Regions:
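Long, charge-rich boundary regions
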Residues: 300, 372-421
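Short nucleic-acid-contacting surface segments enriched for D/E, G, S/T with interspersed K/R
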Residues: 290-307
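Short cysteine-rich clusters marking metal-coordination/redox-active sites
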Residues: 343-346, 361-364
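Structural detector for short beta-strands of small beta-barrel domains
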Residues: 249-269, 339-344
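Short, charged beta-turn/beta-strand-edge "cap" motif at the junction between a beta-strand
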Residues: 261-263, 308-317
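Long, hydrophobic alpha/beta structural blocks
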Residues: 60-65, 70-244
């Protein structure tokens, strides 16, 4: 069972208890470049006031025990923290979890050293996300409305009116984003797996995603929805500058360097090249599904670029590579083509007389000792290039959010952030 649906069930339970919600449920995405399936890269934080914390803890632990799909590899983690403020150590842990690999041992040691009340099943990998979620500080945020199916519909094909989603996006954009792929005429709000989510709408406010949900047309009877405050769409994982002398596998971040090898298109349509950062050369890969391979192909030696992505571990057949998630061109070199000179009398290209012997016009005999230079116009520009929206990750900051920052959001209890149908 997915983390957000389990949170939805817990919130429905808490609504019936004598508790007070003091913030929206928070959905925090951590480092997406960690390879294992249950990797703690999505975690939910619930902040409440209660007079009976021990009872609430027992009930939530029971929810985790009853509904977690441990047989299929789930490793849920649960952390409880009671105080008026969050210690700096939690914030530091959370920042690291955004971009690096944090081991289960590190998480368990953190819990032990700080005497934290916790619970986990499986190998405890979920504790990484649980600690990180408590310590996470929003510097920007979006919202996602997740609408859930009834249990009888789990695993069945989702049937949604495509035109209603397309129209919804045209009306609500840019207050909502990445709902419909116009280029491929494809709905983006519905997942493809058997999970309980029917659709998810992302946007800038609770009002915008709730309004958008009223425009989505489907005949399926749904269970309800919950709105999460999230770091999705903020590129949180790419704010860390990678250290070229210590590029650890699965870390995320950015590098600034100069292209030092000609881009090569390999099998599958993926493009690889290297950049020079200080005295180190870093191999970079731009993949076909991002649809920015043509941009990568047009890079030349000396171009200064800013890249964000994750470090793929070296293997027997492949070397270590930075998997590119964005490509920002800072400076373009002039593309100079050296050619045989043109005879000023005959207006024809001269021919080479041999190595270091200059050039001669085969018609009139005029001579020249140097080649002519011709500047070829560049096909790419100094700008940021992002993948096609079909290849966006949860954390990808789309074009329309580049200058957008939602720093403050008062918890408005009058808004319908939870709705049980």
């Amino acid at each position: 069972m997915c983390t957000t649906f389990l949170s939805y069930k817990i919130v429905k339970f808490l609504e019936k208890q004598k508790i007070e919600f003091v913030d929206y449920p928070s959905l925090i995405r951590f480092n997406p470049n960690i390879p294992w399936k249950t990797r703690g890269n999505g975690a939910v934080r619930l902040t409440i006031k209660t007079r009976n914390p021990n009872k609430i803890k027992k009930e939530i632990i029971q929810f985790i025990t009853n509904y977690s799909d441990t047989k299929n590899g789930a490793n849920p983690g649960l952390v409880f923290f009671q105080d008026q403020s969050i210690p700096q150590s939690f914030h530091k842990f959370s920042k690291l979890a955004l971009w690096k690999l944090i081991s289960r041992k590190t998480a368990k040691d953190f819990i032990s050293n700080n005497k934290i009340d916790s619970f986990y099943l499986g190998n405890g990998q979920g504790l990484v996300g649980a600690i990180g979620a408590i310590g996470y500080k929003f510097s920007d945020h979006t919202f996602e409305l997740l609408c859930y199916r009834k249990k009888s519909q789990f695993g069945k094909k989702r049937i949604i009116n495509k035109h209603s989603v397309k129209k919804m996006q045209s009306i609500t954009f840019p207050e909502t984003y990445n709902s419909f792929d116009n280029e491929n005429d494809r709905v983006l709000i519905t997942p493809h797996g058997p999970d309980p989510v029917f659709y998810g709408i992302r946007g800038e406010s609770v009002k915008s995603v709730v309004l958008a949900s009223t425009m989505v047309d489907t005949d399926e009877k749904l269970d309800g929805y919950m709105v999460f405050k999230s770091n999705q769409g903020t590129a949180d994982h790419l704010k860390n500058e990678l250290q070229v002398n210590d590029l650890k596998p699965y870390t995320s971040g950015f590098l600034v360097g100069k292209v030092c090898s000609k881009p090569v298109t390999e099998q599958g349509g993926h493009v690889f090249f290297s950049i020079q950062v200080g005295d180190r050369k870093i191999r970079c890969g731009v993949y076909k599904q991002t649809k920015i391979t043509k941009i990568a192909q047009d890079l030349i030696l000396g171009d200064k670029i800013h890249l964000g992505g994750g470090i793929r571990k070296a293997s027997k057949n492949y070397e270590r590579v930075l998997n590119v998630e964005f490509l920002d061109i800072i400076k373009l070199e002039k593309n100079i083509l050296l050619t045989n000179p043109t005879c000023k009398t005959c207006n024809k290209k001269m021919k080479s007389k041999g190595n270091r012997q200059g050039f001669e016009c085969f018609r009139c005999g005029n001579k020249s000792f140097s080649k002519s230079s011709l500047e070829i116009p560049r096909k790419i520009q100094r700008k940021l290039y992002l993948p096609a929206i079909s290849a966006h990750r949860h954390l990808t900051r789309p074009y329309q959010r580049l200058k957008k920052r939602n720093k403050f959001e008062i918890f408005d209890t009058s808004l319908e952030w939870l709705n049980i149908f």
